[in-house]
C-alpha cells in the first residue's frame, strides 16, 4: 500500500482524492494526510460537495481534527512551511504537490527534507526535476532514484499522446495549437487587480487570451518535436472541460478516414483508458468527469491538400489529470520496486 499526502487541497488536490475512491485504486493507494491552509470545515464541505463534479459518493466527516471518509481517517495539517510537515513520522511514500506555489525542484525538495520519499508535482516544473511524465507516453523512463517528478500539465497530457501517434504513423513536420481552456481560479469573478492585465477582467464575460508554454511542454516529452510546434491559449466562460484545436502538417499523404482510423485504433490499443475517440455530436459538458487524458472528436477532423490535418481534442482538465496523477504515482512505485527486486 502506497502512503501518500496531498499538499494543497484545491481543485486538483480534491479531484485526486475523489478520483482515488472512484477509480478502484484505493486498494493500492492510501491518502494519509492533507496539508491545506483552509479551515477544516471548509475542507470537509468542499470534499463532500462540488459544483463541477457533484456530490461525493462517500460520507465525509470531521472527527478529532481528522477527515474521515468511510473507514479512512486522514490527518489534516495547516502548515505554510513544507519543511515542518511530519512526512517522515507518517512514513509518506509520495507527496502529491498540488498547491501551485511550490513549482521549482528546489522548493519541492522541502517535502524530501520533511521525510517524504518522493514528490509528484501537479504542474510543469523546472528542467532540473528528475522526470516530466505524460503517462502512457514516457512513464517507462521513471527510475528508482527519481525523487522529484512532474506530471506535466492537463493540456500536455491531452495533446502529446495524439502527436505521438501521428508522428509514429505519418511523420509530423510542424504544428500550431490553440487551447480553448475553461476558466481557472487565477482569474477574477469581477474586474480586479492582477499582474496579467487580461486576467484583471471578469472571467464569465470574456474570452481571455493567456500565456501558455504548451509547445515547450511537448518538446520536453517528445524531443523530436523541438521547434516544430507553437501554441496559444484562450480561457472561456465555462468552469470545466477544455478543447484543443490542433493543426499538424504531416510528411505522408493522408485523408480523414485514415487519420480517424489510426487514432481510433490507438484509443483501443496502446492508449486504452488514456486516449478516447468519439464520432457523436457532443459538446464540452459531455466530457465532464471523464477520466481519460484526451478524447478525439472524429466529427471535426479535417484534411487539406493531403498533408495539413486539423483535429479537435477534448479533456476534463481536472478529472482526467487527477487520474493521471494516480497512474504516475503507481508507476513511480513500480520503478522503485523493480530496482529492489534486482
Curated annotation (Swiss-Prot):
Active site residues according to the UniProt entry: 154
EC number: 1.2.1.72
GO MF, one example: erythrose-4-phosphate dehydrogenase activity
GO cellular component, one term: cytoplasm
GO biological process: pyridoxal phosphate biosynthetic process; pyridoxine biosynthetic process
EC top class, as a word: oxidoreductase
S-S pairs: none
Subunit details: Homotetramer.
Name listed for the protein in its UniProt record: D-erythrose-4-phosphate dehydrogenase
Gene that specifies this protein: epd
